[in-house]
Amino acid sequence: MFDDQDLGFFANFLGIFIFVLVIAYHFVMADPKYEGN
Amino acid sequence: MAEPESSTAAAGGSRLRNACGGVLCAFTLLLIGVLAFSIRLFSVIKYESVIHEFDPYFNFRVTQFLSKNGIYEFWNWFDDRTWYPLGRVIGGTVYPGLTLTAGTIWWLLNSLNIPLSVETVCVFTAPIFSANASWATYLLTKEAKGTGAGLMAAAILAMVPSYISRSVAGSYDNEAVAIFALIFTFYLYVKTLNTGSLFYATLNALSYFYMVCSWGGYTFIINLIPIHVLLCIVTGRYSSRLYIAYAPLVILGTLLAALVPVVGFNAVMTSEHFASFLVFIILHVVALVYYIKGLLTPRLFKVAMTLVITVGLAVCFAVIAILIALVASSPTKGWSGRSLSLLDPTYASKYIPIIASVSEHQPPTWPSYFMDINVLAFLIPAGIISCFLPLSDASSFVVLYLVTAVYFSGVMVRLMLVLAPAACILSGIALSEAFDVLTRSVKYQLSKLFDDSPAASGDSSAESSSASTVSTNSAKNETRPEKTETAPKEKPSKKNRKKEKEVAESVPVKPKKEKKLLVLPMEASVLGILLLIVLGGFYVVHCVWAAAEAYSAPSIVLTSRSRDGLHVFDDFREAYAWLSHNTDVDDKVASWWDYGYQTTAMANRTVIVDNNTWNNTHIATVGTAMSSPEKAAWEIFNSLDVKYVLVVFGGLVGYPSDDINKFLWMVRIGGGVFPHIKEPDYLRDGNYRVDAQGTPTMLNCLMYKLCYYRFVETDGKGFDRVRGYEIGKKHFKLTHFEEVFTTHHWMVRIYKLKPQKNRVRGKLKKLKSGSKASSTNAAGRKKNPWQ
């Protein structure tokens, strides 16, 4: 059964994972060529 | 030939990058929605799928009525089970947005053969709309500062504790949908500002209509947007887009708002809305001036201006004088009590105890800021700074939203909810800017590390040589084309880029535009990213903790952990179930107004006052009864046809939100209308106490007696665990009330009014003769004339 501790772990994991995903998005979209040129 | 190849490769690369970014963005948004929904389920998993607190019970009851009887019956619903004997016109006094939303969801699900109960739909409405609010935040922030900032802001809002506190599963209150409506209306306003599209302007008015349907906080929108328009005009940012964004909103929005019964003509008659009309007039004057300026020669324009200003000032003074006279002629100067208490934080505590008595209307403390927005409080200043680099209409709106929301959140703790989205947006912008610089640096350094082909090295050397001489602003415009209005024009023009290259070749250094590019060393960038992940991690852990521990309690079921394990206090439902099973359908139940909604919803009994608090005199009557001695209280309750009196008492289990702790408000509100109730009579040297030092008035009032009747039998001493001392008056009997039910933990106690004795002719004589025979007997009878 899915109890509150499981939900806590899930929410913590998902929250941090989303942070990482957002950083990944910034990394993907970053364009150093334009910055450099 | 090499140039077209490299340009197609670059175009292909950017297309691939955009495609990857798009997929990542969509996936992240989906996960943000999942997080926003799931983080609000602690209340269901830890407790049960149940409606929370007080107001949600009323909303639930209204939704039940709507789903059972349909929309027309709902509009015409006169509820005779509340505010007895006055009743309440529910259809005309309720904000119907939440109810209609949940009712529509329920109807849709049932049409699709998904037979969910109304209660289940109500319980999960708030988490669903939290996901919507996150996506709306993404859209708004994207309009202001680009997709990256939008994603970050949406992620932060999905789990911000301030919003969680009002939108956990079961918290079926107006704010649950209203925050979504608020953010979405702001998004559409900003979108209209950026595009100048009438389509978005119309959508904006419709969204505003939904907000008006949902929450009284719509006045925030109809004041904030005019302030922003005024700001734009004053700072010389007037444009036709501004006109399109504002004028349809005022006209269409006000017409639509007037359709909501609870607002009606207030939309044009109360001062909360006047600012929008005033700015509407100013906007037209400015538009006219710009139009005439285009038609006339500069000299003629100057003459015309002088003429217009002279006439205009005269007209303005006349209009302002009329407005002031109109406003001053209304009793509250055109402002409602709640709005006045927003502008003057001390107003409520001075004049409206019924507003001041609600804990959520108190000013917040500093720790509550840290609890509710956590690290965002420190990120906001950085967000404000990046909003000014460069300042656009959208970013100035975001800053203005934050500034006003900070002020209002300082007035009452409830409005932290309005601050939360602004805090999330600005923090999202700040973090996104940081991520932009850091990830760009990492990517730049990586490309420098791995590029070792001669051409590439030439490129990279060119990059590195020019890296320090590039204008950061233009670079930013290119990386995030959607960020500013001018960006879309700049992005597709490859010609411009070529021209720039040519210029760079021919003129290697342009001293005017030179600025150092923000490229950090690899180690610093990676460390920065890691530190920001750690910061984000702390924020996530705090939010999950707040959701799980602080904001999930439904308040009708309480729990406590001790060495023996988990204790569940389900006294409220026990009491309401008793009322529903053991009293007549038409019996009237009196209690303090806090429990009115619950009593009508759960016990289905008529109440005297409830959480709507529309009639101060009626509430003051109940307050006076509770503050009076037993006999006087019995007379008041009897005059209101009350059969049962319900009190909440926490002294046995240590539940601090009980009626004894709320009692001084009953005295204040009662004393506000009935001057014979005086607060000092209940205080000993200015201190409120119910121990042996308590005043006789306090120890003899009805509330004390109903709470502490037979309390001494529990432990032999009468020790009150909330107040932390033994009570003052331990042994007493009730003369006009009889105890009919006390819940398992003594948290709810229900008393019945003893019936009035029939007057029997000649009984007085008998009593008198009896008194001669036995004086003690007579004394006993005199004490209790109703038996």
UniProtKB/Swiss-Prot annotation, chain A:
Signal peptide: none annotated. The keyword Thylakoid does not apply. The chain crosses the membrane at residues 9-29. Disulfide bonds: none annotated. Residues 30-37 are cytoplasmic. Pfam families: Ost4. Keywords: Endoplasmic reticulum, Membrane, Signal-anchor, Transmembrane, Transmembrane helix. Coiled coil: none annotated. InterPro entries: Oligosaccaryltransferase, OST4_plant, Ost4p_sf. The keyword Zinc does not apply. Belongs to the OST4 family. This is Dolichyl-diphosphooligosaccharide--protein glycosyltransferase subunit 4A. The lineage of its organism: Eukaryota, Viridiplantae, Streptophyta, Embryophyta, Tracheophyta.
Curated annotation (Swiss-Prot), chain B:
It comes from the Eukaryota. Dolichyl diphosphooligosaccharide binds at residues 414, 597. Its EC number is 2.4.99.18. Residues 1-18, 145-146, 196-197, 235-239, 294-306, 389-394, 438-525 are cytoplasmic. One of its GO terms (cellular component) is endoplasmic reticulum membrane. GO terms for biological process: protein glycosylation. Residues 477-504 have a biased composition (Basic and acidic residues). Mn(2+) binds at residues 55, 173, 175. A motif (DXD motif 1) lies at residues 53-55. One of its GO terms (molecular function) is metal ion binding. Pfam families: STT3, STT3-PglB_core. Residues 592-594 are annotated as: Interacts with target acceptor peptide in protein substrate. Residues 759-769 have a biased composition (Basic residues). Its cofactor is Mg(2+); Mn(2+). Residues 453-475 have a biased composition (Low complexity). A motif (DK motif) lies at residues 659-666. The record marks 55, 360, 662 as: Interacts with target acceptor peptide in protein substrate. Component of the oligosaccharyltransferase (OST) complex. This is Dolichyl-diphosphooligosaccharide--protein glycosyltransferase subunit STT3A. It comes from Oryza sativa subsp. japonica (Rice).
